[in-house]
Design a protein with these regions (language model features):
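Solvent-exposed loop/turn segments at secondary-structure junctions
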Residues: 66-69, 87-89, 135-138
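Export/targeting segments at the very N-terminus of extracytoplasmic proteins
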Residues: 28-63
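Bacterial Sec signal peptide processing site at the extreme N-terminus
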Residues: 12-36
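Catalytic and binding regions of secreted/periplasmic enzymes and modules that target cell-wall glycans
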Residues: 111-150
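Substrate-binding/active-site groove segments that recognize
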Residues: 76-93
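Bacterial N-terminal signal peptides that target proteins for export
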Residues: 1-8
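Second-shell loop/turn segments in exported
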Residues: 29-34, 44-48, 69-77, 94-103, ...
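Short, functionally critical alpha-helical segments immediately adjacent to catalytic or ligand/cofactor-binding
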Residues: 53-68, 110, 129-133
């Protein structure tokens, strides 16, 4: 029994050798990080204008949902704004769940959804964040706003 226990105790040590040492992992340079952040900010600005949502609200949602990690995947939630596949589909998305890990794709459908939450919330950012996280359908129905909800199917900015 002792030899088997000793062998089991060595497994974590052997597996530790398989890990890439931190020094071998190439960190992103500060210039590359700045460039990536600038590109992301440009896309956020684009979708904020396209869907009439404050950029600050989009940034707040991204920080809350993924901490600006476009490859975040927790349970049924995907990407930068942690949108569910079925929710993205309700906004017109036709791809696979993994496609939502692309930041631009994620923003296109998640900001459309956030835009609806913002309208239903009476343009109150705090309420919009809550509705984004919990869903807005029943409140939109109660307020008679279902006909004002939009999708992201068109490449053109939605009409108001």
């Amino acid at each position: 029994m002792k030899p088997a226990f000793c062998a089991l105790a060595l497994i974590p040590l052997l597996l530790a050798g398989c890990a890439t040492p931190p020094s071998a992992q190439a960190p992103m340079s500060s210039a590359a990080e700045a460039s990536a952040q600038t590109a992301l900010d440009e896309r956020i600005s684009y979708y904020a204008n396209a869907y009439d949502v404050p950029e600050s609200l989009i940034h707040r949602s991204i920080l809350r949902e993924s901490g600006y990690n476009p490859t975040a995947h927790v349970g049924p939630y995907w990407g930068l704004m942690q949108i569910r596949l079925d929710t993205a589909r309700s906004m017109g998305f036709r791809g696979s769940a993994r496609d939502l890990l692309d930041a631009d794709t994620n923003l296109k459908y998640a900001v459309a959804y956030l835009s609806n939450a913002y309208v239903v919330a009476g343009r109150n950012p705090d309420h919009a964040i809550r509705l984004y996280a919990s869903g807005y359908f029943w409140e939109a129905r109660r307020k008679g706003l279902l006909d004002r909800l939009r999708t992201a199917q068109a490449d053109e900015p939605p009409a108001n």
